């Protein structure tokens, strides 16, 4: 028999073994001691089992395994079983979730993953660089085209829409796809370098598949999905569709409601690392440890560990985001390694010399960091980096 295994943090150590047994039974067969011997024999294979309990710093930690045949093969069933009504039951946090290998046929994970995305843009030996459209709400397609051209001119690898740039009359998604196709192709013809542009998916959940396919026909090369406002099973269905043949970026919008509390909700590495990887994201965005919405470094690095965990599904690219500027690049490489994405909005568009110079400053900082050269030293001969460091400084 195979199991789904979940670990929880409780706000108390009071009667921990008893509490663990109550949870294991309450989320499976409901009761046990009230059953007669025959009923217990019949239900034994459906019963949750306590694997481990321990106490640490005044908190209780319990691990429970649930028979995999208790659930249907979807995230709704899995999460409702392991943390549905339990999430309402006082100070309790889901800190780890492991699915059995038998689930891989229904949870195949990312189409591309780290190596697939790298292959698309032919960049294999460094972190990827991504920038974000900024200030495009209320602007027209000409403005969007100019921003895309400027970001590409600096040598960016990936560009994504803002997560709040939905399909709209001023910049319709189909037109953005066509512009992206034309600008990316022109960039390739000029430089020989490929890049991807991720368009935000929006609209009715029942129309998303058709929308993505129309966008691909129009030239879309990647998508940004607000996964937690749509649901993990929506991501899974999109990623599993063979006709949706471009990478999908997972955005963490709404996830703060689940990860922010140290006592409640779902641990950030599970919600933004494990689950998007299993659901089929190729990249997963999350708050960096450095910005104004900073996530604790151990949690941010934990997300990256889960995103790049080697197992039955492809590894995916971790994307620490928010508050990123060129002076952070060496720290980012140190904290997240080369299989990661350096993602900036204001750090690109806020460069005093413009967005193209902003991207170039990131490239210069990255080259220096990978060569083991200090950013201060590199800035003495590279103006774009010098101007960026004057504006933002160096974070260590």
Swiss-Prot record:
Reported cofactor(s): Mg(2+)
Binding annotation for substrate: 134, 160-163, 251, 323, 345-346
Family classification: Belongs to the RuBisCO large chain family. Type IV subfamily.
InterPro entries: Diketo-Methiopentyl-P_enolase (IPR017717), RuBisCO (IPR033966), RuBisCO_lsu_C (IPR000685), RuBisCO_lsu_C_sf (IPR036376), RuBisCO_lsu_fd_N (IPR017443), RuBisCO_lsu_N_sf (IPR036422)
Gene3D superfamilies, per database record: Ribulose bisphosphate carboxylase, large subunit, C-terminal domain, RuBisCO large subunit, N-terminal domain
Pfam families referenced in this protein's UniProt entry, alphabetically: RuBisCO_large, RuBisCO_large_N
Name of protein: 2,3-diketo-5-methylthiopentyl-1-phosphate enolase
Keyword tags: Amino-acid biosynthesis, Isomerase, Magnesium, Metal-binding, Methionine biosynthesis
Source organism: Exiguobacterium sibiricum (strain DSM 17290 / CCUG 55495 / CIP 109462 / JCM 13490 / 255-15)
Cofactor: how bound: Binds 1 Mg(2+) ion per subunit.
Enzyme Commission no: 5.3.2.5
HAMAP family per UniProt: Salvage_MtnW
Subunit note: Homodimer.
Gene this chain is encoded by: mtnW
Pathway, per record: Amino-acid biosynthesis; L-methionine biosynthesis via salvage pathway; L-methionine from S-methyl-5-thio-alpha-D-ribose 1-phosphate: step 3/6
Annotated function: Catalyzes the enolization of 2,3-diketo-5-methylthiopentyl-1-phosphate (DK-MTP-1-P) into 2-hydroxy-3-keto-5-methylthiopentenyl-1-phosphate (HK-MTPenyl-1-P).
Alphabetical GO biological process terms: carbon fixation; L-methionine salvage from methylthioadenosine
Additional record remark: Has no RuBP-carboxylation activity.
């Amino acid at each position: 028999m195979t199991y789904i295994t979940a670990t929880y943090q409780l706000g108390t150590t009071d009667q921990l073994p008893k509490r663990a047994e109550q949870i294991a039974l309450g989320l499976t067969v409901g009761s046990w001691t009230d059953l007669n011997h025959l009923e217990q024999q019949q239900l034994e294979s459906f019963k949750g089992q306590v694997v481990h309990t321990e106490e640490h710093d005044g908190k209780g930690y319990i691990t429970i395994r649930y028979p995999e045949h208790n659930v249907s093969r979807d995230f709704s069933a899995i999460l409702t079983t392991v943390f549905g009504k339990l999430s309402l039951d006082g100070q309790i946090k889901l800190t780890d979730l492991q699915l059995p290998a038998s689930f891989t046929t229904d949870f195949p994970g990312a189409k591309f993953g780290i190596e697939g995305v790298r292959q698309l843009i032919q960049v294999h030996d460094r972190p990827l660089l991504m920038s974000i459209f900024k200030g495009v709400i209320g602007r027209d397609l000409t403005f969007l085209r100019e921003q895309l051209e400027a970001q590409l001119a600096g040598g960016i690898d990936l560009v994504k829409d803002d997560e709040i740039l939905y399909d709209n009359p001023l910049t319709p998604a189909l037109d953005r796809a066509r512009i992206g196709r034309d600008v990316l192709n022109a960039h390739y013809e000029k430089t020989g370098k490929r890049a991807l542009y991720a368009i935000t998916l929006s609209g009715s959940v029942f129309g998303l598949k058709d929308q993505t396919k129309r966008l691909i026909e129009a030239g879309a090369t990647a998508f940004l999905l607000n996964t937690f406002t749509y649901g993990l099973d929506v991501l899974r269905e999109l990623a599993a569709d063979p006709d949706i043949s471009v990478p999908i970026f997972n955005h963490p919008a709404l996830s703060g409601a689940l990860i922010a509390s140290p006592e409640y909700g779902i641990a950030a590495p599970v919600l933004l690392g494990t689950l998007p990887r299993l659901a089929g994201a190729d990249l997963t965005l999350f708050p960096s440890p450095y910005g104004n919405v900073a996530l604790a470094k151990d949690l941010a690095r934990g997300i990256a560990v889960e995103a790049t965990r080697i197992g039955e599904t492809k590894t995916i690219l971790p994307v620490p985001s928010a508050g990123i500027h060129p002076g952070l690049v060496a720290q980012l490489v140190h904290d997240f390694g080369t299989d990661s994405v350096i993602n900036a909005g204001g750090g690109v568009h806020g460069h005093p010399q413009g967005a193209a110079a902003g991207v170039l400053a990131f490239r210069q900082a990255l080259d220096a960091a990978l060569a083991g050269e200090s950013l201060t030293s590199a800035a003495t001969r590279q103006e774009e980096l010098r101007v960026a460091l004057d504006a933002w400084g160096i974070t260590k």
